[in-house]
């Protein structure tokens, strides 16, 4: 099971202030059998240029990790933007994150370790920590804002098996 390829899809839109930190958190995983697909939803800031430069640098420093950028021709919103990644996925499992999200270094290795104990799953939910940074201080919230309640119930942060994703999103 340790040979699973994990695809991390990063949904990006006008994310110049956060995207590099997000991408670094993806590539700095303890589990290294990953590919990173960034889907940009027609950003109007310089996000795309930053992403292209980052991918170019990582090709030389981390050549085993595939990193590609998929650019949308027009802004279509998050679901359609994520769907743009489907033709490029090679991984056995998919992790979708936003361009302002951070993966802890052990996130993928813990997932793969847990999957070894329960290998017949198609979807795995997860919890997350909501935080905001203001200068040098970090305020961590253990309670979800009430405006997120509906979103959390509908689509918790999760891992999705590639086969299940292809069946669900292509029908």
Predicted feature descriptions by range:
Residues 1-171:
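Nucleotide-sugar donor-binding/catalytic module of glycosyltransferases
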């Amino acid at each position: 099971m340790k040979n699973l390829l994990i695809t991390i899809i990063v949904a990006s839109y006008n994310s110049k202030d956060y995207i590099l930190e997000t991408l670094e958190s993806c590539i700095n995983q303890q589990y290294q059998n990953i590919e990173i697909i960034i889907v940009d939803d027609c950003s109007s800031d310089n996000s795309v240029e930053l992403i292209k430069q980052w991918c170019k640098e990582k090709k030389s420093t981390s050549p085993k990790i595939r990193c590609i950028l998929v650019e949308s021709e027009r802004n279509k919103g998050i679901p359609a933007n994520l769907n743009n990644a489907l033709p490029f996925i090679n991984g056995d499992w998919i992790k979708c994150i936003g361009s302002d999200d951070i993966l802890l270094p052990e996130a993928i290795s813990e997932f793969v370790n847990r999957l070894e104990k329960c290998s017949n799953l198609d979807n795995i939910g997860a919890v997350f920590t909501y935080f905001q940074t203001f200068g040098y201080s970090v305020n961590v919230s253990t309670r979800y804002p009430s405006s997120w309640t509906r979103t959390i119930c509908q689509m918790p942060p999760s891992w999705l098996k590639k086969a299940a994703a292809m069946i669900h999103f292509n029908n």
